Amino acid sequence: MLSLTAARPADCDALARTSRAAFDADVLVGAPGPGGPPGYDSSEWCRRALAWGRVFVIAEDGRTVGGAILIAHSADWMELGRVWLEPSVQGRGLGRAVLADLEQRAPAVRRWTLDTPAWNLRNRHFYARCGYAEVGIDGDSVRFEKRVEAETPG
């Protein structure tokens, strides 16, 4: 069973391990080499992120398999700073379920944004399937945005 919970400092070793596995595996889909965004493989960076972002543990049957970091820019604008899953659980719909769960947890958010490396066609297709539209290129990254309409009562 999939669960998404708020991270605590004690979770950061597992989050760094799964992040390293996920981002380093991107060499299989076009990355120029192993690596990821700043601090992607650092437990200490994760602990610092707890102070400025909403960090989540993604677990399947109690085992940490990934994570996510949200950055609130305003009451109605949320940035998906990072989301990752270990390669062993990718391709099974977990990523789509995680994004849907994150959106449901923030019903006031109308604008979701993220970026991904331009070379990562797999991510670009994934985000498009989840309702995100490419809205620009910033250096080597593609920016995405998803607008969510307010639900009308009744």
Where are these regions (language model features)?
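A short helix-loop-beta-strand connector motif used in the catalytic cores of GNAT acetyltransferases and
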Residues: 43-57
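A short beta-loop-alpha structural element at the N-terminal edge
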Residues: 3-17
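Conserved beta-strand-loop-alpha-helix junction that forms the acyl-donor binding cleft
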Residues: 87-90, 113-124, 140-141
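Conserved GNAT-fold acetyl-CoA-binding loop/helix
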Residues: 17-45
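Conserved acetyl-CoA-binding loop-helix of GNAT-fold acetyltransferases
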Residues: 85, 91-104, 125-129
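A conserved beta-turn-beta hairpin within the catalytic core of GNAT-like acetyltransferases
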Residues: 72-83, 90, 108-109, 140
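Conserved GNAT acetyl-CoA-binding A-motif
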Residues: 99, 106-118
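Conserved beta-strand in the GNAT
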Residues: 57, 63-72, 79, 84
